[in-house]
């Protein structure tokens, strides 16, 4: 028989990690603004007309929406300070918090597909050097709609009764089905394992193809290929690390190779590590993309140049 647990949401809240949430919201807001600026530049600046930037647009859009959703599905649900905000949202849009909670799983899939797409783009630049740019530039919006559809489909297999948040008699309550929740966690541990293997294999294939191409092109094209490959590999490496961490947490639930006291540390570190994939892309671009670095550091360089005797 299924175990149904009904708990007022405020009983699960505490002020224990309030400082961490505030810090995450601070750097998250700054990074989202940075990502919005990059989105604008990629869409309208001719300097970023290459098709790879269309894939980066998809990544940025996904990560912006994921970060916004995490406020309501994770961060605000941990602290009493934000309870009035959650109550207002649920009263205004009934079912909003339950949808937001399921959104965590939607973005789990979508972030994987967009990270994988960066590798697929790099491979297609070698296998179809003539037509790949036109294809990605022309169809990237339709491609993103398809990725969203697949992610929604994968998320829809979750039973609705596993976890939901409702307003009852003026109180927010969390309703969870223990057996269904365990099943969901097991399914996503399998997803994490499969996605990790896929990303690793595609990454290796991407390195193989790009290394062959680099030897056959001009110096200028070689620099561009290496830059885009570095961006793809670093981003893929970070995302693989998040998947591996999720797999380790799933294994720990069964084998308990870490003390129970580590549970709190695990959960807190998962939130921080999740930010690595959600918020890291603009900084990876700033490090490895000379065009972006010049654009944002131009004013600083000019000031420095004036001080040279």
UniProtKB/Swiss-Prot annotation:
GO terms for molecular function: transmembrane signaling receptor activity. It is found in: Membrane. It comes from the Eukaryota. Its main location: membrane. Keywords: Membrane, Transmembrane, Transmembrane helix. GO terms for biological process: sensory perception of chemical stimulus. The chain crosses the membrane at residues 22-42, 140-160, 190-210, 230-250, 272-292. It is a multi-pass membrane protein. Belongs to the nematode receptor-like protein srg family. This is Serpentine receptor class gamma-47. The gene is srg-47.
């Amino acid at each position: 028989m299924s175990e149904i647990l009904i708990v007022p949401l405020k009983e699960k809240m505490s002020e224990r990690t309030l400082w961490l949430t505030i810090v995450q919201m601070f750097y998250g807001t700054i990074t989202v603004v940075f990502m919005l600026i990059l989105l604008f530049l990629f869409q309208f600046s001719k300097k970023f007309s290459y098709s790879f930037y269309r894939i980066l647009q998809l990544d940025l859009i996904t990560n912006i929406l994921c970060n916004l959703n995490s406020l309501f599905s994770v961060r605000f649900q941990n602290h009493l300070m934000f309870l009035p905000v959650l109550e207002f949202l649920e009263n205004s849009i009934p079912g909003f918090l339950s949808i937001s909670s399921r959104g965590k799983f939607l973005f789990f899939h979508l972030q994987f597909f967009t990270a994988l797409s960066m590798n697929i783009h790099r491979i297609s630049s070698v296998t179809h050097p003539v037509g790949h740019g036109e294809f990605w530039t022309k169809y990237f919006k339709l491609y993103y709609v398809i990725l969203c559809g697949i992610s929604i489909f994968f998320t829809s297999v979750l039973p609705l009764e596993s976890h939901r948040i409702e307003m009852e008699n003026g109180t927010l309550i969390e309703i969870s089905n223990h057996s269904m929740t365990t099943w969901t966690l097991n399914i996503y541990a399998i997803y994490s394992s499969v996605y990790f293997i896929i990303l690793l294999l595609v990454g290796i294939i991407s390195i193989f193809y790009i290394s062959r191409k680099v030897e056959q092109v001009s110096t200028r094209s070689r620099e561009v290929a290496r830059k885009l490959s570095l961006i793809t590999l670093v981003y893929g490496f970070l995302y693989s690390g998040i998947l591996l961490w999720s797999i380790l947490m799933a294994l720990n639930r069964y084998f308990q190779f870490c003390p129970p006291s580590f549970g709190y540390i695990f959960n807190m570190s998962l939130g921080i590590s999740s930010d690595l994939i959600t918020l890291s892309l603009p900084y990876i671009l700033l490090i490895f993309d000379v065009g972006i670095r010049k654009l944002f550091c131009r004013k600083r360089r000019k000031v420095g140049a004036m001080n040279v005797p």
